[in-house]
Amino acid sequence: MHPSTVRREAERVKVSVRVRPLNERENNAPEGTKVTVAAKQAAAVVTVKVLGGSNNSGAAESMGTARRVAQDFQFDHVFWSVETPDACGATPATQADVFRTIGYPLVQHAFDGFNSCLFAYGQTGSGKTYTMMGADVSALSGEGNGVTPRICLEIFARKASVEAQGHSRWIVELGYVEVYNERVSDLLGKRKKGVKGGGEEVYVDVREHPSRGVFLEGQRLVEVGSLDDVVRLIEIGNGVRHTASTKMNDRSSRSHAIIMLLLREERTMTTKSGETIRTAGKSSRMNLVDLAGSERVAQSQVEGQQFKEATHINLSLTTLGRVIDVLADMATKGAKAQYSVAPFRDSKLTFILKDSLGGNSKTFMIATVSPSALNYEETLSTLRYASRARDIVNVAQVNEDPRARRIRELEEQMEDMRQAMAGGDPAYVSELKKKLALLESEAQKRAADLQALEREREHNQVQERLLRATEAEKSELESRAAALQEEMTATRRQADKMQALNLRLKEEQARKERELLKEMAKKDAALSKVRRRKDAEIASEREKLESTVAQLEREQREREVALDALQTHQRKLQEALESSERTAAERDQLLQQLTELQSERTQLSQVVTDRERLTRDLQRIQYEYGETELARDVALCAAQEMEARYHAAVFHLQTLLELATEWEDALRERALAERDEAAAAELDAAASTSQNARESACERLTSLEQQLRESEERAAELASQLEATAAAKSSAEQDRENTRATLEQQLRESEARAAELASQLEATAAAKMSAEQDRENTRATLEQQLRDSEERAAELASQLESTTAAKMSAEQDRESTRATLEQQLRDSEERAAELASQLESTTAAKMSAEQDRESTRATLEQQLRESEERAAELASQLESTTAAKMSAEQDRESTRATLEQQLRDSEERAAELASQLEATAAAKSSAEQDRENTRAALEQQLRDSEERAAELASQ
């Protein structure tokens, strides 16, 4: 008897279609409630109705013909899940119906040893995740659970039933990955704890093996024993899977998710001695794929990161469509097909599904569509792809080791023989027992050999892993040593850079200090010059003011003397009028003189008014002088504040430089002391901090320079104000000179008038005799006029007294103003002395800062020497590490030699086992031939016995 060949089955991809109910968005849209899809579940036919009207005028022109012609699509199964019955009146399909039709056969194929695959394809929001997972993705249990949890539940029920028979046990492992933006991420991979959002992604690589096929390198597979374990792992994966809300779907999958179930059978056999032999049996892989839905950007209205995700999703689905077209074309046309190789490697999704499409797998596809007219084009496109996928033919084979398959066949033969032995002829039963014993011994021997080979293979795999680990450790040590050397070089280079930068900063600081001191010296000199010039101008103005006041007083005294002379002359006239009689001509002349005296008195009143105006002008000049002094004080205060800010900035810069120096020293020591990546990160962070401190110092220096410029602008503004004040003062002086000239002109005119009056008085004395006749007539009138003149003179006297009092008040104000100015001058001198003392203290502080800087430089040099000593220690440690590495390499070489010797021994043992197996096979063939001959002889004897028995019976 020869071993049977591997069991292979060729069949098409099973394609099903599920039509979901209308959702809320479609019910609220004007055309959303219009159903364009009809289905016959019994006949597995889907009909896309004619879409009439012009409401969809914005659709693509390429769909125009499809809109005007109804199309029928034939599939393997159709699930009508709309609330109303289908075209034949059948009730809507439930989740349980989908599982009975699709999920149950998948479980049967898995336990038969066939690879299988189920993937959901369709537009976004068409119900793929609901069909695969269920109504609530976070709770995969209950009546609404999808195909995936139902398949897992059936697997565990079948597993318990098989293991109850006691011949084998099944091991189930689960993996969960997603394809996001053309990168494969392990959703069950170990992530860092305590990181928001699950931590970083755990990416795996897609590889292809000649015998294993496509697999994921580095994927984490977790053994599961119940549905609760599966639900827990899937919920963990869903927690880190990429989903988002779009216009089409509140929870849209932004990646393709694949749940991988691996089933491995472990068969057991008990020998006559009671030893239990365990061998590998069948194995299978089941891929449950939840594809991300295709979406139109105009409908889903995604942007930013979601737009990028939609681009990758549509690209991978387009590649899947191309693969389906190529495989379908190859299956239908054979050698005449346009392409001979499908573009699996154009996308990670199609590369993973390579065995499921046209390979070693029994594949089921479920296409989900929407019945609404809003999704007419997407529904029609999905149905076309699904119909095209039905043409793909897969050739699936049972995944079982040939030796294990032979053992299983022997066990099946032994079971058949045990059943044949029940109630049979004793001789035949005895013969069968002998054959059964031979078969059992052969099966046990094969099982033992297979177990030994498996153990040997496992041992070799362990040795290979150890060898690879040793090589990896060596390369890791070498790379670590190189990285350490590079790190030390970079650290030393960084320390040199930091030292050079520190020197540059110190030089820059010294230069800035010198420039600021020069600028301050210039500003002080300019302010001193301006102060001296203003003091000289104020002194000259004070002298001019005093001379003007003295001149005005002198003029006032002269006017008082002239007024006294006029009064004396008036008294003389009155006496002349009283003592003699005047003529009418004298009277007229006297009246004329009296009129002239009155006009002269008016002129004197005008002179008094002018004097009062001059007094007010003097007061205004004094007020402007006070304002000028106040502005000068403000300028001095601003200069003092600017100087104080400068000193504070210098102190702040020195503090920052000291801190930067301390940071750099600490960083240099830490960089030389530590050799791992964390220290390098701290060095970068500290360097960044130092750089920020330097930038802050530069910004502070810039702000100080800006303040200095503002102070200069303020000083210039004050200088312009002082110039304007000087111009106003010059204008006032000019007005005063003009007034003085006018008063002098009026005084000369008064003197000329007095001379004229004197001449007139002489003429009057000459004419007195002729006027005595009219004196008596005019005496009464003159007496009345005299009384008026006396009253007017009294008024003039009172006005003169008030003018004298005003003059005294002006003198007092002048004295007080002079005292105030002298006090301000003394305060300015005291302030200048204070500024000089502050400048001396600043110079002393600068000398102290220079001494501190020198001490800091000495400390830095000492720390640099210590750092160099530390570098020497590190170099010695590196040499010891190199020596240890050489020792480890020698140990590794000896280990490698030992492993190679063990490997050669294993190969020799394998050769011996192979020769023994060949001898066993030859002996087995001879035994089988003898057994066949014996069987033929026994059968001949049995026939002879039966004939003999028949003859005896007939007799």
Curated annotation (Swiss-Prot):
Residue stretches of biased makeup (Basic and acidic residues): 785-794, 824-833, 863-872, 902-911, 941-955
7 X 39 AA approximate tandem repeats: region residues: 704-955
Spans annotated as Disordered: 682-712, 725-955
Coiled coil: 426-955
Compartment(s): Cytoplasm, Cytoskeleton
Superkingdom of origin: Eukaryota
A single Gene Ontology CC term: mitotic spindle
Annotated Sequence repeat ranges: 704-742, 743-781, 782-820, 821-859, 860-898, 899-937, 938-955
SUPFAM superfamilies: P-loop containing nucleoside triphosphate hydrolases
GO molecular function terms noted in the UniProt entry: ATP binding; microtubule binding; plus-end-directed microtubule motor activity
Record InterPro entries: KIF11-like, Kinesin_motor_CS, Kinesin_motor_dom, Kinesin_motor_dom_sf, P-loop_NTPase
Keywords per UniProt: ATP-binding, Coiled coil, Cytoplasm, Cytoskeleton, Microtubule, Motor protein, Nucleotide-binding, Repeat
Chief location of this protein within or outside the cell: cytoplasm
GO biological process assignments: microtubule-based movement; mitotic spindle assembly; spindle elongation
Protein residues bound to ATP: 122-129
Residue ranges occupied by any Kinesin motor domain in the UniProt entry: 12-392
Family, as annotated: Belongs to the TRAFAC class myosin-kinesin ATPase superfamily. Kinesin family.
Designated name of the protein: Kinesin-like protein K39
Protein's organism: Leishmania chagasi
